[in-house]
């Protein structure tokens, strides 16, 4: 179903069954598959391909040669009906690729809202990208990666499969991330190692002075105290009882399977 207020360029192909919302814009030479849903006000600039069971929210801007919902690169994939979901107000720049999930990974690749995916960024099968994240040029997420809210991943950075990039993390460019990055941390290098707390980013997002001090103390317990990881976890949990900002660390530890970068 195509809303009567949507614009479809004469050279675009919108297959029967696709749902195109009000005031959406499908530019020249775009291809929209039969199981695709595109929300109100979303713009496909030109030469964009959206395929598979893909749902895109409202007011997104998707630039030329982006490919969304295409068959993933997992060798186990055998054509199962897996999905891609994208939220609202994202900017998805030229040649970005977002692949559909796998049955083994839950069947869903998901991107939240208000994100910026710069040129050539890649979001592999079963990844989850939160809200207000930035993936810079050529940033690459392997399968099953989680990127939490407000995280920034620098250009040319590769993230190993199943890794977690915590909330408010800043990963420097040209890095290789092979373990989980705790929230609030600046990471850099190959393999990526911690370089302190993302203080400037947290200030811009309105964190209080007291909250910043608590986050720094949690970071020091994890990385500067000489304690074992289990010992640091216990003390960080105690700190989290007094400072809600620190709870992000304890929640991260519960999810982490690859262990924090060291």
From Swiss-Prot:
InterPro entries assigned: Acetyltransf_C (IPR029098), Acetyltransf_C_sf (IPR037157), Hexapep (IPR001451), Hexapep_transf_CS (IPR018357), Lipid_A_LpxA (IPR010137), Trimer_LpxA-like_sf (IPR011004)
Localization annotation: Cytoplasm
Source taxon at top rank: Bacteria
Molecular-function GO term, any one: acyl-[acyl-carrier-protein]-UDP-N-acetylglucosamine O-acyltransferase activity
Pathway: Glycolipid biosynthesis; lipid IV(A) biosynthesis; lipid IV(A) from (3R)-3-hydroxytetradecanoyl-[acyl-carrier-protein] and UDP-N-acetyl-alpha-D-glucosamine: step 1/6
Keyword Repeat part of the UniProt annotation: yes
Keyword terms: Acyltransferase, Cytoplasm, Lipid A biosynthesis, Lipid biosynthesis, Lipid metabolism, Repeat, Transferase
Protein name listed in UniProt: Acyl-[acyl-carrier-protein]--UDP-N-acetylglucosamine O-acyltransferase
């Amino acid at each position: 179903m195509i809303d009567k207020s949507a614009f479809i360029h004469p050279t675009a192909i919108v297959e029967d069954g696709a749902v195109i919302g009000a005031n959406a814009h499908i530019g020249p030479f775009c291809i929209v598959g039969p199981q695709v849903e595109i929300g109100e006000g979303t713009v496909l600039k030109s030469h964009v391909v959206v395929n598979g069971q893909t749902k895109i929210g409202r007011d997104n801007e998707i630039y030329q040669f982006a490919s969304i919902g295409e068959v993933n690169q997992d060798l186990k994939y055998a054509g199962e009906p897996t999905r891609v979901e994208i939220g609202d107000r994202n900017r998805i720049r030229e040649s970005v690729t977002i692949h559909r999930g796998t049955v083994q990974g839950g069947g869903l690749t998901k991107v939240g809202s208000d994100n910026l995916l710069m040129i050539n960024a890649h979001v592999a099968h079963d990844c989850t990208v939160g809200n207000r994240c930035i993936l810079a040029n050529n940033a690459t997420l392997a399968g099953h990666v989680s990127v939490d809210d407000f995280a920034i991943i620098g250009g040319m950075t590769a993230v190993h499969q199943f890794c977690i990039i915590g909330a408010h993390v800043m990963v420097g460019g040209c890095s290789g991330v092979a373990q989980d990055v705790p929230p609030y941390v600046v990471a850099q290098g190959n393999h990526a190692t911690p370089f302190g707390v993302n203080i400037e980013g947290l200030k811009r997002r309105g964190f209080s002075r007291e909250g910043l001090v608590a986050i720094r103390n949690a970071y020091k317990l994890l990385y500067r105290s000489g304690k074992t990881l289990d010992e640091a976890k216990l003390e960080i949990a105690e700190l989290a009882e007094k400072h809600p900002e620190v709870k992000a660390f304890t929640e991260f530890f519960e999810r982490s399977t690859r262990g924090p970068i060291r």
